[in-house]
Swiss-Prot record:
Keyword RNA-binding: no
Pfam families in the cross-refs: FliW
Listed PANTHER family: FLAGELLAR ASSEMBLY FACTOR FLIW
Sequence similarity: Belongs to the FliW family.
Role according to the record: Acts as an anti-CsrA protein, binds CsrA and prevents it from repressing translation of its target genes, one of which is flagellin. Binds to flagellin and participates in the assembly of the flagellum.
Protein name, entry field: Flagellar assembly factor FliW
Cell compartments where the protein resides: Cytoplasm
Main location per the UniProt record: cytoplasm
GO BP, sorted A to Z: bacterial-type flagellum assembly; regulation of translation
Alphabetical keyword list: Bacterial flagellum biogenesis, Chaperone, Cytoplasm, Translation regulation
GO cellular component: cytoplasm
Quaternary context: Interacts with translational regulator CsrA and flagellin(s).
Claim: Chaperone is one of the keywords in the record: yes
Gene designation per UniProt: fliW
Amino acid sequence: MKIESTRFGTLEVTSEQIIRFPHGIPGFLDEKAFVHLPHDENSPFSFLQSTAEADLSFLLVEPFSFIPEYEFVLGDEMAGELELSEENPPQVFLIGTVREKITDMTVNLLAPIVVNRNKGIGRQIILDKTEYSIRHKLFPEAQAQGTPEGGE
């Protein structure tokens, strides 16, 4: 199938590349189907592009590359809904926001995206009883002295 993206142009994707979000994504509840687009093979950055809305895409960040201590408990009900198992482990992503400079990039630790790639289903979950922030700086001040590759 072909999808249009204002960021990536026309994309040819297979049904296996589609990730379904039965509950939508908070703020975009009508958007149920997205395609995951890695930035490159070894990058912790990727994009989640809506299959229906050309101008709707999210920057995703693989959290453990930057925040190895990031953890949360996924309840049995949620694990069951996503059909997670040892054979179908979760992939976890954070939605990122780039400010004027890449060194000011923040990620939402409070609402991770959890995906079962083998089954093609995902959900953004809202964590409770946590001190995680919705605007966690990805590059702490100590690292901000040197700009990451591709930054300004």
